[in-house]
């Protein structure tokens, strides 16, 4: 019995689904035993019954039932009792034969009835339009997951306007998004509010773009836009700005606390309403609620600091708060001039600058900055130095890097850790102060350096969750000027954290995709050797690898051998050779060794030296013999030929001693055995003599 389209449509309802299931199951059930024949009864004729529903016009005229004889109504009580008894018996006997669409559903428990989620609370002092607006967006437009943010405490107010109230809603699809935004704009227009909807495609505009897209796809065939490319139609986000309600354009006089006139101007009054409509994926990607909540939190913290509610020593900077992990310090580049970030709020009075000063004692400075250029400076001098001078900040950060790298491991861990009371250490307070108001690229490079340093020290607090927060912050702040090397370092840090469960590996893969997405959004290639090598190198450095990690490693190794990528650098090849040699994966070791010839590139002296050193360290006669026979011959045929350096000669001698232990002694005594040809024919004796003959001009 096949399912008809009508049955499939009916399966959308839970009750219909259950009834349809009974209908299908009944066809496979065993036949029921025949029921006993009931005693025949003489029943009175029943009133005619029809399932036809008359129209209003037909209801106005007498029905056919009204013209029927009222004999059934005049039957004696005895006949009615017999009819009721017969009906009851018939129902009991043939209840199972009633079709499902005539059966009465059981009453539903109140807890199973779907109730719409509650609407967000309206803040006090909101405009009168706020409550009907929330109801319209929820009930009429059908937006899900409504959230209302009260951003009226942000000081100074954002560019959207003063006293911002922001409503968020999730649309079910792209079409639902545009239709809902268009209806919202028209609804507001009927109430005298002119709203501006950024990202909205009007009805005619959307149809025109769809026609053009279909025509272009027909002309291009399969060579059109790739999946996921920007087609100019899919936005996923519409910002409906209602403007500032209650705005006054009257100029007024401002007076200070003493009643003295301090100026004239237009007051910032009224409330700005903004409705953010997004699809579910776009809302998760942008995370605007988190962004605006962070802006509000930082504004309140800044106001509390100015008012003296927080201690000055607990200084943190957002979004430049240090969170980190690391590998090796790298120098920070100076911009060469003092630039200010446009998204920063600067203090305009000396009193506010004093409130933001770093409160560290001279003893702490002497301890933390021992051996630095500014070790004997006073706290006020350090604070003035770190005020706005970008070059001085960069120089101080470089000295801090050198200082941290010179410390023993225990002291370095203490420098990047929190104190017992939960406050940052003196080193971290100075670091936070130094990166404040730096250009975005330099600030992020400094923060990533601290992250690498903490990861190299295996700091317990710098785990995968903290690294995920840092990556999310980079996405929100738009770290567009960070170099590609820093993103590759982030990938190394992600997979260098040991994970023993499949869930942890999946989280690592998700974070790595966030980093790769940031690279892709900058227009850079993502499937390149630096990215693939960073992931493989980090995965192979972890000892315990769950099945998900092994599967991920296999996928990246397939990319290494099959993807069409540009030729890797010398350092990338050497790192892969080292990591495969450490794990004794010699087949993959030699596959990496052949990458340069595939790109018609010459292998360098460093690469040959690395191969000979790794083979000699393995101390295996067969491997040493094969390496000498293959690699030495290839070395002579490189264009131009590879010269034998002192380090390479030392590694080659070690390989020859492993392949033929007597070759060295025979080669040294060859002058005494010049008449004996058997020693001259030995393969590695000739190689020893050749190498020492070439070492004089190749060293």
From Swiss-Prot:
**Family, similarity comment:** Belongs to the ATP25 family.
Organism per entry:
Neurospora crassa (strain ATCC 24698 / 74-OR23-1A / CBS 708.71 / DSM 1257 / FGSC 987)
Q: Which residues form a coiled coil?
A: none
Q: List the residue ranges of the region (Disordered).
A: 46-95, 310-341
Composition bias type Low complexity, residue spans: 53-63
Q: Where is the transit peptide?
A: 1-31
- The protein's name is ATPase synthesis protein 25, mitochondrial
Where does it live in the cell?
Answer: Mitochondrion inner membrane
């Amino acid at each position: 019995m096949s399912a008809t389209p009508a049955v499939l449509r009916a399966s959308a309802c839970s009750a219909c689904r259950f009834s349809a299931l009974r209908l299908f199951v009944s066809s496979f059930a065993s036949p029921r035993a025949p029921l006993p024949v009931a005693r025949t009864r003489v029943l009175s004729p029943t009133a005619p019954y029809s399932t036809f529903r008359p129209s209003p016009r037909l209801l106005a005229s007498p029905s056919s039932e009204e013209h029927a004889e009222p004999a059934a109504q005049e039957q004696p009580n005895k006949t009615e009792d017999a009819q009721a008894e017969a009906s009851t018996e018939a129902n009991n006997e043939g209840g199972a034969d009633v079709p499902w669409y005539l059966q009465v559903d059981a009453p539903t428990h109140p807890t199973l009835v779907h109730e719409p989620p509650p609407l967000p609370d309206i803040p006090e002092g909101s405009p009168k339009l706020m409550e009907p607006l929330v109801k319209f967006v929820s009930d009429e437009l059908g937006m899900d997951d409504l959230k209302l943010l009260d951003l009226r405490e942000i000081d100074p107010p954002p560019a959207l306007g003063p006293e911002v109230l922001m409503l968020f809603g999730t649309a079910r699809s792209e079409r639902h998004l545009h239709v809902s935004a268009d209806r919202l704009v028209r609804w507001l227009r009927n109430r005298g509010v002119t709203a501006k909807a950024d990202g909205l495609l009007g009805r005619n505009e959307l149809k025109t773009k769809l026609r053009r897209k279909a025509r272009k796809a027909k002309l291009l065939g399969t060579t059109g836009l790739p999946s996921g490319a920007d087609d100019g139609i899919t936005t996923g986000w519409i910002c409906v700005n209602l403007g500032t309600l209650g705005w006054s354009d009257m100029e007024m006089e401002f007076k200070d606390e003493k009643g003295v006139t301090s100026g004239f101007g237009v007051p910032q009054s009224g409330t700005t309403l903004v409705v953010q409509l997004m699809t579910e994926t776009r809302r998760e990607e942008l995370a605007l609620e988190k962004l605006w909540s962070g802006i509000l939190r930082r504004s309140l913290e800044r106001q509390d600091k100015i008012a003296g509610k927080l201690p000055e020593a607990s200084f943190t900077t957002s979004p430049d708060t240090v969170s980190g992990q690391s590998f090796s310090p790298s120098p920070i580049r100076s911009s060469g001039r003092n630039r200010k970030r446009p998204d920063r709020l600067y203090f305009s009075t000396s009193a506010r600058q004093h409130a933001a000063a770093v409160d560290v004692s001279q003893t702490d400075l002497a301890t933390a900055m021992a051996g630095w250029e500014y070790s004997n400076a006073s706290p006020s001098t350090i604070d003035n130095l770190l005020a706005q001078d970008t070059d001085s900040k960069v120089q101080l950060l470089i000295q801090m890097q050198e200082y941290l790298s010179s410390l023993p491991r225990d002291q370095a861990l203490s420098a990047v850790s929190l104190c017992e009371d939960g406050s940052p250490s003196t080193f971290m307070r100075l670091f936070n102060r130094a990166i404040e108001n730096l250009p975005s690229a330099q600030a992020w490079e400094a923060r990533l350096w601290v992250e690498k340093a903490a990861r190299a020290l295996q700091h317990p607090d710098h785990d995968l969750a903290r690294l995920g927060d840092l990556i999310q912050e980079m996405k929100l702040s738009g770290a567009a000027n960070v170099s590609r090397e820093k993103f590759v370092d982030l990938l190394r840090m992600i997979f260098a954290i040991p994970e023993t469960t499949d869930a942890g590996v999946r989280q690592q893969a998700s974070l790595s995709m966030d980093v790769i997405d940031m690279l892709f959004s900058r227009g850079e290639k993502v499937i390149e050797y630096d990215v693939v090598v960073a992931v493989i190198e980090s995965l192979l450095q972890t000892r315990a690898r769950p099945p998900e990690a092994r599967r991920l490693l296999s996928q990246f190794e397939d990319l290494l051998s099959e993807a069409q990528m540009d030729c890797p650098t010398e350092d990338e090849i050497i790192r892969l050779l080292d990591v495969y040699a450490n794990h004794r994966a010699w087949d993959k070791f030699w596959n990496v060794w052949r990458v340069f010839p595939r790109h018609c590139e010459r292998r360098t002296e460093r690469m040959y030296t690395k191969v000979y050193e790794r083979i000699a360290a393995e101390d295996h006669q067969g491997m040493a013999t094969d390496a000498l026979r293959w690699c030495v011959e290839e070395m002579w045929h490189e264009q131009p030929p590879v010269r034998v350096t002192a380090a390479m000669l030392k590694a080659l001698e070690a390989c020859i001693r492993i392949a033929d232990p007597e070759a060295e002694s025979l080669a040294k005594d060859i002058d005494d055995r010049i008449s004996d040809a058997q020693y001259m024919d030995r393969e590695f004796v000739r190689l020893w003599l050749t190498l020492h003959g070439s070492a004089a001009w190749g060293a």
